[in-house]
Curated annotation (Swiss-Prot):
Name under which the protein is recorded: Oxaloacetate decarboxylase 2
Cofactor(s) the protein requires to work: Mg(2+)
Record's cofactor remark: Binds 1 Mg(2+) ion per subunit.
Assembly with partners or alone: Homotetramer; dimer of dimers.
Native organism: Pseudomonas fluorescens (strain Pf0-1)
Organism placement in taxonomy: Bacteria, Pseudomonadati, Pseudomonadota, Gammaproteobacteria, Pseudomonadales
Enzyme Commission number, as recorded: 4.1.1.112
Pfam family, one: PEP_mutase
Amino acid sequence: MIERSHHDLRKVFGELLQGDTCKFAASVFDPISVRMAYDLGFDVAIQGGSVASLQVLGAPDIALLTLDEYVEQVSRVGRASQIPIIGDADHGFGNALNVMRTVTELQKAGVAALTLEDTHLPAKYDEQSHVLIEREEAAAKIYAARFARSDDALSIIARTNVAVTTLDDSIARTAAYQKAGADAICLVGVKDFQHLEALTAHLRVPIMLINYGNPALSNVEKLSAANVRIVVNGHAPYLSAIKATYEALREQSGTEGSELSLPELLSKYTLSDSYREWAKTFLKSEHDSN
């Protein structure tokens, strides 16, 4: 097997973005899984931040993972990969200056592209979930990311959640991110092709979708025609690994009784109930200080 350099893989990813076909990204989490993805014919892969949080912390995806922890995880994947890796840069781990550091570190880790989202993370005191930062600040992060990359082949992908704001706001946001120089726009929460058309008619850059297997957005020909070049259908491989690990350990231990479903496993072993209680206690103004 001839190894390709990180720069070469970034060029390959850029060619995917500029091509005319939609590709489904493999959700990978370690060297073996990315080698499997390559062997099975995937052209691109992603190391999800939520998956890294499960791996490293055994915690829900609530912005507990640090930049160093994520970089260490994605570096392992990057060293073994023969296909481009998309890194999940979350919110850039802070403001625009933090974004610059994030880009530098993820570039060294070998990612071919990174997504940078406009969600306010972590949640502030007494703040509802899924709050978006001002689009001017988000656009400044895109400018900063472009400034910080030393390899122009590294793709900067601006990500936004269209399900938590209005159509007009989503259009204004993506237009601003395109103007700021994003190489692609990543959309979360698109309902169907009609919604997709309304959201992207003004865009010239390629589209990436995170749709978690939405059947209304499964037609590859229509996705390709809509300028969608990358689709992420969730992170089933690692979730399946969690389920398989539990079942193997359960069999080895000889434990009897009812088997836990995957949602039950995730809730129990990521301490979800505890984190919810801690959030109610420490992130809400109504908590009792006595």
